[in-house]
Amino acid sequence: MSKKKGSLSINSENIFPIIKKWLYSDHDIFFRELVSNGCDAITKLKKLEMMGEAEIADDEEFKIQILANPKEKTLTFIDNGLGMTADEVDEYINQIAFSGAEAFLEQYKDKTSEDQIIGHFGLGFYSAFMVADRVTIETLSYKKDAKAVLWDCEDGMDFTMSDSDKADRGTKITLYLNDDSVEFANIFKAKEILDKYCSFMPVEIFVSDPSAEPEYQTIMEEELTDKDTVIEHIVEPAKTEEKEKEDGTKETVEVEPEKKKVKILKRPVSISDTTPLWTKHPNECTEEEYREFYHKVFLDYKEPLFWIHLNMDYPFNLKGILYFPKINTEYESIEGTIKLYNNQVFIADNIKEVIPEFLMLLKGVIDCPDLPLNVSRSALQNDGFVKKISDYITKKVADKLSGMCKTDKEEYEKYWDDISPFIKFGCLKDTKFCEKMSDYVLFKNLDDKYLTFKECLEENKDKHENTIFYTNDPVQQSQYVNMFKAEGIDAVVLKDSIDQPFISQLEQKNENVKFVRIDADLNDSFTEEISEDELKDATEKLTETFKKALNRDQLDVKVQKIKDEKVSSMITVSEESRRMQDMMKMYGMSGMDPAMFGGSGETLVLNANNALVKYILANPEGENTDIMCKQLYDLAVISHTPLNPESMTAFIERSNKILEILSEK
């Protein structure tokens, strides 16, 4: 062909500055785009060969080579795919083939949000100009009698086309990096980026530095293949030893035979796992493979609890693996990672428009060929197809969890403490997930037995219908726990911060059901009857005595005959008041006066059956009454919640004082 010059066919010269600035939020994305193009060229050639429209040698090995040359400041991408003719270069490269280019420029020239532009109009190849001042393409089509073409473009607009001496089918793209982008010619940087985007592409990918000193390896002669470049043959002579025979004479014996080795150029190693685990059928995968894949991809030394293998062909193509990681405490970070792929090409992490928000606590990979490589999130938000994908993933996770609970509840219970924050969060965030999982949410009771919501209601049905008692700290609230156990009343343990909004949701969905913390009130199950006159007299006297001793005029005192005589005092806080206080803490309002919202709800309960309380009642002006009142109050608080540092110091000093008083008697 005669040499051809021209400018890229677009009605504005402003396209490449816009591409450079806004098309991609990550400038290293050009690696993915160019490698993906090469992968597509190979895939299309394979399909043409299957249809009898192309011929491929039986021993052909498809691959993509990347040459990172820091000395020349170049990056070269080579594939042995279907290549292009001069006409195809003119059509696909010289003409930026999308409609409405002027409208596109008008819409985006003043925009500053890359989300509005990413992935529009399929401009993948042109991402090369984000990092290169000059790009060349050498290509030879698979078509019979095709001639090789050289395309050369500087500054992203003016190009020349001419014949090339390229003899092998495929495409070679060379980027002459600009001064701001020479780091990409470093082989270690190139490998890092390729590992990010191309670790699982279906074609082998090899990276090398042509300017580096060659590396060698030594193999046995029988391991030599036609692909190896031989440097030299090495013969290691047989090893012998001198041994004494029975008659006392000595002889030389061969202990190791002669070894024939070959020194060769170091064999290249592909950075791509062409058949990642998610592409296989679940029946073909072993537990060990699932665990190895998890450690490799997520660099997590801990073992995953279990996993879900997604494998769907209709009504859309979707494959993937979701792992449930082990979380040691609720304070440990539970931020997961869901990697999204398109035909084994990495797109992005944690795209919430595709992956339901609550699944972001998991770790996994999702591969959906029907999603574009580059797509604006604003477009995804209103995409019905994407909503179907999200709903399907949610359904599969719910099916796995509910199925495990139904078929192997013991195993499900073993995982429950680790997965409960995830499931509860899912129920709060996703209505459909909540509907599927509501019968499989478990609550651990005081005997470490796991119960469903319905079973919890059955436990106390005879004594407290539609009430579920709970404790958020069984150790701190052990006095209350012991009283509940003594009366045969069950309670569940709710330790996680997500439990409060979760039980509020359950109460909204089940209007007659109430969750009540075990220190909210002392009901008739724990007390004996007391006459009104006795109650009134004791309450008035003890209230006056304790208010004076504690110097708290607003103290709310309640006198009851608690069955357990050893219990002297307790603190109760109404469920409504406590939830209000929790909400205030959550929203940073803990410094505000609870009285603004109806008081603290805290009540000091004194046991009229206890000897110490009886003594104070009989001796309101006694020598030690003041110190006893303070001590009983702090003991009540300690059984309810930790003392603050100042109160704890006073409690310790007072305890020492009481011991001194006792020692003097």
Regions found by a protein language model. Give the residues of each.
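GHKL/Bergerat-fold ATPase module in large chromosome/replication-associated machines
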Residues: 117, 135-158, 178-182, 188-665
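GHKL (Bergerat-fold) ATPase N-terminal catalytic module, capturing the glycine-rich phosphate-binding loop
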Residues: 1-184, 192, 199, 220-222, ...
